[in-house]
Amino acid sequence: MPRRRWRWTRMTLTRAHYKIDGQLCLHWRPNSGNSRDNLQIWWQLKNWLQNQLIQQGLSLMTI
């Protein structure tokens, strides 16, 4: 009986936002392999996250 192999699918973050109750909600989709789009999305997320933290009086030094 052949063993079942699990394949890791790289995921791309497409959207991030806060829900009404304050929880962070992340939207993912399978990676299409377009690394330029991927980079752009991560860059937008970084900027968005930075803005969220600044609004809350925090700063994100590591990103």
UniProtKB/Swiss-Prot annotation:
Its main location: host cell. It is found in: Host cytoplasm, Host perinuclear region. Transmembrane segments: none annotated. Keywords: Host cytoplasm, Host-virus interaction, Inhibition of host innate immune response by virus, Inhibition of host RLR pathway by virus, Viral immunoevasion. One of its GO terms (biological process) is symbiont-mediated suppression of host innate immune response. Coiled coil: none annotated. GO terms for cellular component: host cell perinuclear region of cytoplasm. It comes from the Viruses. Changing residue 20 to V: In strain: AH-1. Belongs to the hantavirus NS-S protein family. Expressed from the S segment by a leaky scanning mechanism. Interacts with host MAVS; this interaction may reduce MAVS ubiquitination. Antagonizes host MAVS-induced type-I IFN signaling pathway. This is Non-structural protein NS-S. It comes from Andes orthohantavirus (ANDV).
